[in-house]
Regions:
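Second-shell residues forming the walls of enzyme active-site clefts
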Residues: 133, 154, 186-197, 286-450, ...
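Short acidic, glycine-rich surface-loop motifs adjacent to enzyme active sites
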Residues: 108, 164-185, 263, 268-272, ...
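Active-site-proximal loop/short-helix segments
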Residues: 221-225, 260, 264-278, 282, ...
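Preference for extracellular/luminal or secreted protein segments
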Residues: 2-168, 405-483
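Glycine-rich, aromatic-flanked loop segments that form ligand/cofactor-binding clefts
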Residues: 195-226, 246-266, 287-312
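Solvent-exposed loop/turn segments at secondary-structure junctions
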Residues: 146-151, 180-184, 213-218, 261, ...
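Second-shell loop/turn segments in exported
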Residues: 110-116, 125-128, 148-154, 174-184, ...
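Hydrophobic faces of well-ordered beta-strands that scaffold small-molecule active sites
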Residues: 139-146, 173-177, 207-213, 261-264, ...
Length: 483
C-alpha cells in the first residue's frame, strides 16, 4: 500500500516513538538517516516498510547498547511538546559578555534612531511553540537548500511528494534557492506554492522562501528568469531615491513569484575608491543613506530583507588560503566606518540581520580568531545588547571554506546559537548540524529557554509576515498559519 499523505501525522508520531527508543540505545543518528531515506521514497515507500526500517534501526542500536547511558537523554527530555507555554518576550541570548565590548558601542545609535521593531508579538506564538517537539523547534531555526531537505545531490526544480514527506519529518524554517533551481516563472510559482502547502500541513507555519537578490553580479532571479530584468549592481545606484525604487521593484517581482525573503542589501563599506560592485561605495555616510533607502524600498514592497554582513566585511584581510577573513578595526573605528549602514537599516525596521564570518580580534580579546557568526562579543554583546537589535540574527552561509575548514558539521549550529544567532543558514550537512543542536539541547549545553528565545522570534516573524503579505494579496509568499 502506497504511503498515504493523510497518514503523515500518524507516521510522525510513530517515528518520534521510535526515535526515543533509538536515542536510549545511542543509535539516534542512524535512525534519523534511515527514516529520512525511507520517507523520501515518496510514492514508492510503504507504511509497513517505514515501520520495519525504523524497528530494524532500533534492533541494531540495541546491539550497540551503552550500559553507562553515555549520551542518552534524561527521561524529562523525551521528544514531546513542552508542558508549559514559553514567554513570548524576545529576550536576548544569555551569554557571558566580553569585557572589551565597551558601552560606547551604542553612541552611533542616536544618529539613526533606535532599531525599529519589525515583528510584533503575536498572542498565538506561545501556544504554537509550546506544542512543538524539540526537533520541530530546532528544524525551524534552519534555512537550507531544497536539495538538503530531500537529501539529494541532484538539482531540485519541483516540489512534489518527496518534498512533502521530507518537510513532514523535518519542518525547516526556510528554503533558499539558487539560480539552478529556477527555470521559469510558472515552474518557480508551482515549486514555492507547493512547498508552502507542505510546510503548513507539517507544522502549521509558512516557510521563509529566500534568495540572494542583491542585483548585478549576485542576482538569483533577475536576468535569469524570463521576463525579469537584472536591476544592476548596487554601486550603480547613487541617490537614495534610485535605491528605494530599485529595491522596491526587486521586492515586487520576488513576491510575485512567491518568495518572501531577500538576503539583501549588502551593507558593507568598501575601503577604496574602487568600490566592490556589491556595495554602495566607500563613504560610510553615503552607504548608510543608500542602505536605508534600499531597506525602505524592500519594506514598501512587503518582502522581508536582511542587511549583511555584520559588523562589515568591506575592510577585511583574507589569509593566504583565501578562507579566513579578519578585521583589525577597533570598536571606535567600526563605529565610524562599518556600523553606520547597519544602524541605518535597523532604524528603518528589518526582520533579519546577517552576521558574517570575519574574525574581529580588536573587539573580542580571548576569542579573536573566532568568526563573528560564532562570537557572542559580536552577536550578543554588540548587535543585540549595545545596538539594541531585537529581530532575527542569521548566520552567513555555513558551507563556505571559512567555516568548513575549521569546524565540524555537528558544531556549527551549536556555536551559532551559543553566540546568540537565531537562524542557521546552509550548513554543509543539514542532518549533522541539526542533530548537533538537538544533542546540545538534550545534554543541557543549550538550554530549553535559549532554544525557545530563537524559536519565539522565528514564529513571531512568520506570523507578522503572514499578516502583512496576506493583507497585500501575496498568498503564496505569505503561506498559511494553522488556526
Amino acid at each position: 500500500m502506497a504511503l498515504n499523505p493523510l497518514k503523515l501525522d500518524k507516521n510522525r508520531a510513530y517515528l518520534k516513538q521510535i526515535d526515543q527508543q533509538a536515542y536510549q540505545h545511542g543509535w539516534h543518528r542512524l535512525t534519523h538517516r534511515q527514516r529520512r531515506a525511507e520517507v523520501t521514497l515518496g510514492n514508492r515507500g510503504t507504511y509497513v516498510g517505514l515501520a520495519c526500517a525504523a524497528v530494524a534501526a532500533v534492533l541494531v542500536g540495541m546491539l550497540a547498547f551503552n550500559p553507562l547511558g553515555i549520551g542518552a537523554p534524561r527521561a524529562s527530555e523525551a521528544e514531546s511538546p513542552a508542558s508549559t507555554a514559553p514567554s513570548t518576550h524576545s529576550t536576548a541570548a544569555t551569554t557571558t559578555s566580553a569585557n572589551d565590548v565597551a558601552t560606547s558601542a551604542g553612541k552611533g545609535t542616536a544618529a539613526y534612531g533606535a532599531p525599529a521593531v519589525w515583528a510584533s508579538e503575536d498572542p498565538r506564538t506561545a501556544q504554537i511553540v509550546a506544542n512543538m517537539t524539540t526537533q520541530q523547534k530546532v528544524d525551524q531555526l534552519f534555512i537550507v537548500s531544497p536539495e538538503a531537505i530531500v537529501g539529494t545531490s541532484s538539482t531540485v526544480t519541483a516540489a512534489g511528494s518527496t518534498t512533502e514527506n521530507a518537510l513532514a519529518l523535518d519542518p525547516v524554517g526556510g528554503i533558499i534557492y539558487s539560480s539552478a533551481n529556477l527555470e521559469e516563472a510558472s515552474q518557480i510559482k508551482s515549486m514555492l506554492s507547493n512547498s508552502q502547502t507542505y510546510s503548513n500541513e507539517a507544522v502549521g507555519l509558512p516557510l521563509f522562501l529566500a534568495v540572494n537578490e542583491e542585483g548585478g553580479s549576485v542576482s538569483t532571479v533577475g536576468g535569469h528568469v524570463e521576463g525579469i530584468a537584472n536591476v544592476g549592481d548596487a554601486a550603480s545606484l547613487t541617490s537614495a531615491n534610485d535605491a528605494k525604487n530599485t529595491y522596491q521593484s526587486v521586492g515586487n517581482y520576488l513576491l510575485g513569484l512567491g518568495f518572501n525573503l531577500d538576503l539583501a542589501p549588502v551593507a558593507d563599506v568598501s575601503t577604496s575608491s574602487a568600490s566592490s560592485p556589491r556595495t554602495f561605495g566607500s563613504d560610510p555616510n553615503q552607504v548608510a543613506s543608500l542602505v536605508s533607502a534600499a531597506v525602505e524600498g524592500l519594506n514598501a514592497s512587503g518582502i522581508l530583507c536582511s542587511p549583511k554582513h555584520f559588523p562589515g566585511i568591506g575592510g577585511v584581510s583574507v589569509d593566504a588560503e583565501g578562507k579566513a577573513m579578519t578585521s583589525n578595526a577597533t570598536l571606535a573605528e567600526m563605529e565610524s566606518s562599518t556600523l553606520p549602514p547597519f544602524q541605518a537599516a535597523m532604524a528603518q525596521g528589518v526582520p533579519f540581520v546577517m552576521v558574517g564570518h570575519l574574525s574581529t580580534p580588536a573587539v573580542s580579546s580571548g576569542n579573536g580568531s573566532t568568526p563573528a557568526s560564532f562570537n557572542s562579543a559580536i552577536v550578543t554583546d554588540l548587535l543585540r545588547n549595545q545596538l539594541g537589535y531585537q529581530g532575527l540574527i542569521i548566520t552567513d552561509a555555513l558551507n563556505t571554506d571559512a567555516i568548513t575548514s575549521s569546524y565540524s558539521n555537528n558544531q556549527v549550529g551549536v556555536l551559532a546559537l551559543q553566540a546568540g544567532c537565531d537562524v542557521i543558514l546552509c550548513p554543509e550537512d543539514f542532518d549533522d548540524a541539526k542533530m548537533g543542536v538537538i544533542e546540545a539541547v538534550r545534554s543541557g549545553k543549550i538550554s530549553e529557554d535559549r532554544l525557545n528565545q530563537s524559536v519565539i522570534r522565528v514564529v513571531n516573524t512568520k506570523l507578522t509576515m503572514n499578516n502583512k503579505l496576506t493583507q497585500a494579496g501575496f498568498t503564496t509568499a505569505a503561506g498559511k498559519v494553522r488556526q
